[in-house]
């Protein structure tokens, strides 16, 4: 289900002043490492491929990075932890379009939406990632549409398959 989305930073561009440093681990778009077959059936590597195990990655393909301080988002990205459904009349195990902000960013902080807050988000804007054996949804700050007050029955949801591998 998941393509390897973790990379180690070997070099950073001089043109950008980034908090990402050499040696940091980054979570990138799945197409950076994608291998596909063209119309003639020939195996091709992504346009990000350089040589050996080295790939170029544009800043908009980097969603999260880990340094000595922990995980940090890039730009307007944020990560949401799904919560368990408390509905007895559904087979869905998680609540739709509601979750707990795991990793935020400065624009959300300015709106007083901080990690640990219960938030609602728009449909079809989230991408599923496995970060340290936790299933999280990556989305843009603009996809967060409401901050909820806790009712007390919210519980994080992490499917059992996320713990393997």
Question: Residue ranges of each PLM-predicted region?
Answer:
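Acidic-enriched and Gly/Ser
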Residues: 1-165
């Amino acid at each position: 289900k998941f393509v390897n989305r973790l990379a180690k930073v070997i070099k950073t561009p001089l043109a950008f002043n980034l908090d990402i440093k050499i040696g940091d681990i980054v979570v990138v778009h799945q197409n950076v490492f994608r291998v596909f077959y063209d119309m003639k059936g020939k195996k091709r590597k992504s346009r990000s491929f350089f040589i050996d195990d080295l790939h170029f990655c544009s800043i908009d393909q980097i969603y999260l990075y880990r340094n000595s301080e922990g995980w940090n988002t890039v730009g307007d990205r944020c990560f949401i932890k799904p919560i368990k459904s408390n509905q007895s009349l559904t087979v869905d195990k998680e609540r739709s379009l509601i979750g707990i902000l795991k990793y935020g960013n400065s624009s959300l902080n300015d709106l007083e939406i901080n990690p640990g807050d219960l938030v609602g988000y728009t449909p079809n804007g989230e991408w599923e990632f496995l970060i340290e054996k936790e299933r999280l949804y990556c989305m843009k700050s603009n996809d967060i549409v409401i901050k909820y007050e806790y009712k007390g029955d919210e519980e994080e949801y992490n499917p059992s398959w996320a713990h393997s591998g």
